[in-house]
Amino acid sequence: MNVYVQRDDVGLGQIHRFRIFVQSGGNLHSATSSTTVPPTVNLNSVTKKESGSIEDRAGSGGMTISSGENISKQISENNSSTNPKHANSESSPLLSSDFSSSSKDYHKVGAFTDNTNAINIPEQTRGVSHTSSSPSVGTSFSSINLREVKNPLAGSDSTAPFINSTNSVLWIRVRNREARFRQAAYLQGPFTLCVSVWNDQFFDEKNSLLNFDPQVQPSTSFWVCVPYSCFSNQQPIYIEIASQAIFKDRSINFELAISQSQHSIRAMSAADIDTLHAFPALHVEHQTPENLWRLPYSSFHSKNSHLVVLTHGMHSNVGADMEYLKEKLIESSKSVKELVVVRGFTGNYCQTEKGVRWLGKRLGEWLLDITGWGSASFPRYSHISVVAHSLGGLVQTYAVGYVHAKTHGAFFQAIHPVFFVTLATPWLGVAGEHPSYIGKALSYGIIGKTGQDLSLTPLNHSIESRPFLVLMSDPSTPFFQAVSFFEKRILFANTTNDYIVPFGTSAMEVSSLGKVEEAEGSDKVMPTHMENGISPTLKENEQTVQSVGDNAKKIHASSEESGSSFSKALKSFVGLFSYSASKTTDTEIPLVKNEDENARKPTEPNCLGSDELDVSNSSNQFFCSAPKLDPTSTFSGVAQRVVNTFTNLFIPAVPTDSYFFKYHLHKVVVSDNVHDPAASFSTFDGITELNNMNNGFLSNEITIAKNWHRLAWRKVAVRLDGDAHNTMIVRRRFPNAYGWTVIKHLTEILFEQNTSTAYMNPISFDETTTAAWLSEIYEDNSISV
């Protein structure tokens, strides 16, 4: 029997990526891992999910894109090499289509139960020739931890020949081997995996292979059947396995199996082995988390190198959640022939509730360490840029100020600051976006010191009592000074579908605070957004300025209401986990604002792991979508936000199949303008005066916005579907694919020219003021690295 088996563990925030291909020609006894791999063409695929047994229970939620010619055929029951003998006699149709030159959209999406004996799969996969030898099988067992994503691809040796014919198939199974009871232990993990299988041509209608499932639960499996045309001629296939853990640093054990029959895969599941390489034709190249983030050798010997520091948000990580962003930054830098080193700090994982100061100081100390401060090798880089998501934007603001003050300005004189970028960062906190009882809950420490910072709670400090976000925005502080040193300051803000950090606070637009519901029904940005690079004047925005006072009244008034609506929201949230809530006929996948006649709506989706999935209708698409909120419900705006936030988190809306073929045509950037600081002061003066008439409810937010607007900012407003907050950084490559265009837009901004040669002028600063803040603000005994 040809077998490849591997068992391993992966850690919090890591990604393991695998690239596999099958050696072609001859009887394949002497296949080597050094064989070159040609481009992938004409790929087809089928995804199969299992349910029923604890050994092979299918993961909930998923997606398949497959394409090819004449692929709607049924496997004969006699072909035992491709259909397990123990399967029952019922059949599930393959969702597939024939292609022609005049057709528009040919791929379908589907999921399959394991209670089948005959499955419609591509014609190329039928009739695997009967031989006396056992079918080839490759199996990899591994364990994923909260920081890891694994892709299983490694070389192997064996003496058994590979069955090489046009009727051959390749089965791939990824199984979450954690105990079933851990499905309920969400706050201890969660112990779920995100699995993706794709090829180089996944975006081509006629040559696509793309299968993914963002929620492979413990004791469930994710199956993909790859026809011969997909792996012939040594065409590569990629497998990526990512941990979905958020709250705890937990290991998740998984198994990867590759074979020509499902029966062989199941037989190997019981084997008590860690690693077995007995599949000579199968070549596996494994990129470990360390390899993915390994520094280029050239960076140690270059005088001009650009360091890009990535900072994650709350309950997030750099290694897995920002891997896609890192990959695209490096790719884009090659177009301008610039040596870019992308790094991220991992020391704040699972500790993001400890406050901006605590997190920022640790990040600052790490930054000094990797740049060689205090050693003969300083500076190790010539330029530096910082890119952060969500809470990370505030953390990196503190970190650059900390570095600036501790080195008395020498750091940024030696390493030139270029780009300061934030993505969905709560610059104005979150108190102005929600009723006051939400702010009070945060101020009481419901999410630790970070919640107090975001609710603009006054500091308990012997010298400074202003809220910390107000303090950081003060022009006399090293934080403000350090941010001002950067050549370009860019912020990205979601106009819709971001209930965690809405547009008002992420764009530093006071007049937009608390207007999430209004933005949901409009394609336009809030009225204070700049047009043609110039902020509107007070006269032009009289109605907008008035809305600030009205908005303050509404937010303040909502705090007087009873908490009944919030309680109902929580009850609704609990209902999301019931079977009845998961099986709804009135569901809808959010589509990008583009008309597409080929985009279909799912029918009867079952997202939460039902034992049987209805796939009898070949036109069905299987998506994991969220139940729609009843528009007549009595929920308040904040209650709806709570439900929507958790719905997006637990049941993420994945892109439609047609999106992957036409994603480059979808426009998500609503506006992209440069803010002129000189044109905004009259507007802020009017807003301040009006706010004073309403008991100064938004006085802190106005102060923060006014201070930061002393600097020039490039503001990019985007409109994303699904979970916009995490989609903005493409937390997972395919489930969050709506954010691809945002990342592309960001990389085009950062690398429109070679920054190493474009920005060389030294900075200037007030050293006396900077040094004075060092001991007063962040050499606090309560802060330890």
UniProtKB/Swiss-Prot annotation:
Q: What ranges does the record give for the region Disordered, renumbered to this chain?
A: 29-99, 115-140
Might you give the EC number(s) for this enzyme? 3.1.-.-
Short name of any one Pfam family annotated for the protein: DUF676
- GO cellular component terms listed in the entry, alphabetical order: cytosol; lipid droplet
Could you list this entry's UniProt keywords, alphabetically sorted: Hydrolase, Lipid degradation, Lipid metabolism
What positions constitute the catalytic site?
A: 390 (charge relay system)
Q: Which GO terms describe its molecular function?
A: monoacylglycerol lipase activity
- Family, similarity comment: Belongs to the putative lipase ROG1 family.
Q: What is this protein called?
A: Putative lipase C4A8.10
